[in-house]
Amino acid sequence: MGDTAPPQAPTGGLGGAPGAGLLGGGSVTPRVHSAIVERLRARIAVCRQHHLSCEGRYERGRAESSDRERESTLQLLSLVQHGQGARKAGKHTKATASTATATAPPPAPAAPPTASQTAAPAAPAPPPDYHHHHQQHLRSSSSSGGSGGIDGEQQQQPPASTPGDQRNSALIALQGSLKRKQIVNLSPANSKRPNGFVDNSFLDIKRIRVGENLAAGPGGLPVNNGQSQMMSGTLPMSQVPLRKTAALPPPPTHSPGNGLFNMGLKEVKKEPGETLSCSKHVDGQVTQENIFSNRYGDDPGEQLMDPELQELFNELTNISVPPMSDLELENMINATIKQDDPFNIDLGQQSQRSTPRPSLPLEKTVIKSEYSPGLTQGPSGSPQLRPSSAGPAFSMASSGLSASSPIPSVPQSQAQPPPATGAARALPSWQEVSHAQQLKQIAANRQQHVRMHQQQQQHQPTSWPALPSSAGPSPGPFGQEKIPSPSFGQQPFSPQSTPMPGVTGGSNQSKVMANYLFKASPSAQGGPLDVLLQPKPQDLSRSFLNNPHPAMEPRHGSTKPLFHFNSDQANQQMPSVLPSQSKPSLLHYTQQQPQQSSITVQPQQQQQQPQQQQQPQQQQQPQPQQQQQQQPQAQQPAAQPTQPLSNQPLLRAPLPLQQKILLQKIQNQPITGLGYQVSQQHRQDQHSVVGQNAGPSPSPNPCSNPNTGSGYMNSQQSLLNQQLMGKKQTLQRQIMEQKQQLLLQQQMLADAEKIAPQDQINRHLTRPPPDYKDQRRNVGNMQPTAQYSGGSSTVSLNSNQALANPVSTHTILTPNSSLMSTSHGTRMPSLPTAVQNIGIYGNLPCSQPSTYSVTSGMNQLTQPRNPNQLIANQNNPLMPRPPTLGPSNNNNNNVATFGAGSVGNSQQLRPNLTHSMASMPAQRTSNVMITSNTATPNWASQEATAKQQEALKSAGVRFPTGTTTAYAPNQSLQQAVGSQQFSQRAVAPSNQLTPAVQMRPMNQMSQTLNGQNMGPLRSLNLRPNQLSTQLLPTMNQAGTGLSQSRTVSQPPSLAAGGFPSPNQSSRAFQGTDHGNDLAFDFLNQQTDNMGPALNSDADFIDSLLKTEPGNDDWMKDINLDEILGNNS
């Protein structure tokens, strides 16, 4: 009959005028909402018809089960008396059916007994339907007396199903009376489930209802509650049992809620209340029976009838269920993860709960950090070692933040809060122990694990990508912290890397790195970034973010200890952590640094461009990162805005601890002390210089410069960095706007100058003359000067670092110079170090190509150009940065092209670069020594270098693989890969790819950077060295985004040159490094677009036109008329 009832549903809906009449008033309007209202009306009519059929069936069933009702009444009484004893005895299938149906799966057994007892499956179910409807009708009519019997029956049934009915009724006696009515309304499902039992219990409940009214009612309620509670753990079960017990799936959480829900539905469907009740029960039955299809013989019919109502109720039920899911998830997370609150805080701290997160971060840091290792469970052990000690060492003050940093990225990615929870759960087991233990072990193991973790992080490139996702915000702090500290930075960076590689370190690194970055070097991000970015925050954001990190990290992986020293410039910090992670990690790190770069740079003049560009970068970088690290997307975007905030709370709070850690790490790393101590001096210089440079953002620069200059090493610097962090972030915000405006103005001026230089670009593409150098200087000085406002300081600061490193590690700088220049190139700090090397080293190696060929001199000279990171890197510095950045990708070209930073390039370019570099180093060294102006001379030098590079390119020496290899040793990890890849690419496709590739990176960069890179990319499209100059600031950022997008587009390069890829992009956009960018298809094209474009404007235009369809928008922004006019 249930089957016939559903067929009647349409009939009822259509012909059930009375039933529809109840809703008929709104029939016209429902017809407007015909799909829903008609279904509801049809269901109501069907429910009424079904109620009638159920009523008839119920009457028949009652007649049939009158004996069974008596028996069940006696049995129910005995069951109520005996409680579970009778139920356990299960003498009657009703009791078993009740229990089974209440349990949920057993409805099948219950249905057979019910069917047997009812004699007809359809007959049993219909009577329950009628009974339900009758109960609902009584309930809707509020006739507790009438419903008393039904309620009593149903209530008695729940008692049968629940052993503790009397106890529950005693507790719920009063509530039970009300809830019992509601639950009885719900319990019709229960009574319906055992049709015979329901029928019996209906009569029996009438009898029992007097004495067992409360007990049965509460019993019924407890049954629902028991199921609800039992099932609340398992939402599906809770819903199902509630559907069983409550007959309404919607109130799975609360059986009273079921009644309330039914009441609400009744009120909604007030007129057909009985029908509604019936339909509800039918729906509840249907849901119950859909879940337990065989519970009632009538179920199929009801299900057929109720599917839509069931959907509606299921939606309502789902509505109620999600809260259950949320609460349950929270409870599960809290229960499963003791650190769940930290987890939530982590999720919220950077994204939503930033306030609690600082306090919880320590716990959550481990979870988050461990979660990052969870992503990298393989390296998780090492992250755990590091996280437990090194990570929590940071997590002492910053482990929470570290964890929150990586996991907040998860919240930011908030597809992952559950994964984070799962990962946190997986990790919590370790982390639960390591929260306290880690903090304890952190102090003891912190130093060892800092070093170990650095190594481990080198072994954690895989976790690095995943971790940055979880450590999305962490990348910001992480990137910040990464950049400044090479060794400490690495250690904190490793922790910070750890969220990326290890996780614990992630947020801890965030904090610790923040401490390092912001404490010792308030801007690990800012300092190196500022150092790098101040000269050209845009280029730095790209070339530094992209290039310095990759270069640094690859090199650092190659010459980790050296980069410890040099990474004192924050390059090592990342490389040492990232050597193995550098490929995936470098992207994160680079991406994080771009965030930080945008953060740091944003406070600087480039804040707007870095933000605009870096945001696209971060958007695009997350794409590669998404490929490698999906979370970094949220990390960077969220970290960029969040990072200042998270850095402040995350970094500031842990600053004292991290100061201690930094001091300890500094003590642990006295070797870096050479660079760091000198760097500290330089850091102070950098503070002063960067303060001068940063102007509004001296604190970011001091932070970043101190970072670069072993900022964390200095507790003074740490204190300064702490203060500077607040000032920095505040100034960053202010300077972000100011410098964004300045950057926009500069970009506009650069674009205007680009237009004029485009003529010279045409000349200088072939061979950038000194005029173009001057123009580039002007452009570079305009942008870089503004960008380099801290650039001179950066150069000076890094020069100081470079002095410290070159002086202390002059020999190291020879290998390290590549490494350092890579490291420095990798990070702007390296650039300044290179700049200092150019100043100091520039004096030493600058004039001396051999010294410069000691990649330190050349690379650092180049990288001081990288400090002009746009400028220097655009030409030779561009190459060194691509070498740095492109250790794998651009390194090849960078090294070869720059030769400067690169040994091979140093050698080949040394003939050219060396001569030119001898001259250029003279110039550039002067320029680099000039630092800010050096950046401009670096542009000029880059022009010369670009000429030389082009000569090398056209000579085929372009970027000698030897250079790449020479540089690769330094950047062996990524440089070898990217260098070889790009050396191959760079050598062969340099001219060919450059036109098209150049356009591609330009397009991607412009696209990546969107409007922001567009202007610089337009300049890039203009493709004069000046274009590189102007573009490179943006394009370094764009390059970062581009290389990151390229990293996306070029995962292979990304792997090896993932960060090199960004660096490459930076390099690619850094003028001459377009040749270096040759390493990338995009950047190679750009680089060679410099070359080929230099060689032929037609090729450049062809590359613009042919490289990508995306060039259309990009070309629109570029003003092909200008390019064509200049190039034609």
Swiss-Prot record:
* Biased composition annotated in UniProt, kind: Gly residues: 12-22
Residues with the Phosphoserine modification? S177
Kindly give the Pfam families that the UniProt entry links to this protein. MamL-1 (PF09596)
> Low complexity composition bias: which ranges?
113-122, 395-426, 453-473, 484-497, 590-649
**InterPro entries in the record:** MAML1-3, MAML_N_sf, Mastermind-like_N
The source's domain of life comes to Eukaryota
Q: Where is the composition biased (Polar residues)?
A: 347-357, 374-387, 431-446, 566-584, 677-695, 778-794, 1039-1052
Record's GO cellular component terms:
nuclear speck; nucleoplasm
Q: Which UniProt keywords apply?
A: Activator, Notch signaling pathway, Nucleus, Phosphoprotein, Transcription, Transcription regulation
Residue ranges, annotated region (Disordered): 1-22, 81-167, 343-509, 521-649, 677-714, 758-794, 1039-1073
Which Gene3D superfamilies is this protein grouped with? 6.10.250.970
The family classification in the record reads: Belongs to the mastermind family.
Q: What does this protein do?
A: Acts as a transcriptional coactivator for NOTCH proteins. Has been shown to amplify NOTCH-induced transcription of HES1. Potentiates activation by NOTCH3 and NOTCH4 more efficiently than MAML1 or MAML3.
The molecule here is called: Mastermind-like protein 2
- Provide the species name: Bos taurus (Bovine)
The root-end lineage is: Eukaryota, Metazoa, Chordata, Craniata, Vertebrata
